[in-house]
Amino acid sequence: LIEIEETHHVAVEQTVMERILNKALDSDVDMDRLERLLDLREQEIKRQERQNFVRDLSAVQMAYKNIEQNAINKHTNSKYATLDQYIDAVKDGLATYKFALFYRIKNQTEKNVTIEITLSHPSGNEISTEGTFPIDSTGSKNSIQSLGSTLTYARRYLLGMLLNLASKEDDTDG
């Protein structure tokens, strides 16, 4: 019998950053040129991250579920989709592609509240939109209920706008 000894040699290619750092350690390096190379590398990383963000956002939009109008506005007798319908339609896709949503109150007065929604991606890219909404003082709501009603309404509309969502019956242009 012949005994065969196997060895595995793996070629490890240096990353761009490792090559730049090794060059920086050379005593005859042109620091201005090195800075320009680092700037170019940073620009390329940002471009790739933006591409990944747009690619994942496009995939998320294809993963949306239908939004059903599940409630009736007692004042206008019209149907609408509640906030939970919007969230249910997008949450699985957002989780799959590691997106996160954030809301924050940017400004509040006795009459209005400004809300911002941000969609964040692991690449560091974000998109945001905001709106100013009148505090809903209709009916017999106390001030906390009025604000809560307005925030729910604002979150639904901003989520729809940011993620290009529409309930089935709202989408009248196909």
Regions found by a protein language model. Name each.
Residues 1-174:
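Polyanion-binding surfaces on beta-sheet-dominated domains and ring/shell assemblies
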